[in-house]
């Protein structure tokens, strides 16, 4: 709760709402050190949400910065975290998330910036940014970029698995 501004009751309410959005209802009294790695990761996500509970405040868009928010999470919690971030963006806020999983990034991001060696190597809408050429250039591996048939979202598979 440290770093939050407002009355104690307001701060506790913001913290409870953030924990609920992170799927941690009832965790308020649990010691952080006793949580699993995935639970600790979701606590970190809740901390970010508690800092900016509303995507727009006083007519100005707020920003939510997330560094690997899906690390250590099972797929169900990965999706829940990224859907919550997408809801924040849909409400008028800005979400800047660092992800290493291009498949998740393609599913949840409107725009992608792909970096390699600290430099931007590709950027733009995910449909245009994720390509065989980008995968080869950034990761030095052959990949097969396909499209999920129902939604035309790109996905990446190693070549050896796609034969």
Where are these regions (language model features)?
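H-loop/switch region of ABC-family ATPase nucleotide-binding domains
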Residues: 99-100
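Conserved ABC ATPase "signature" region
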Residues: 12-27
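ABC ATPase nucleotide-binding domains
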Residues: 132, 136-163
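Catalytic Walker B motif of ABC-type/P-loop ATPase nucleotide-binding domains
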Residues: 57-59, 64-68
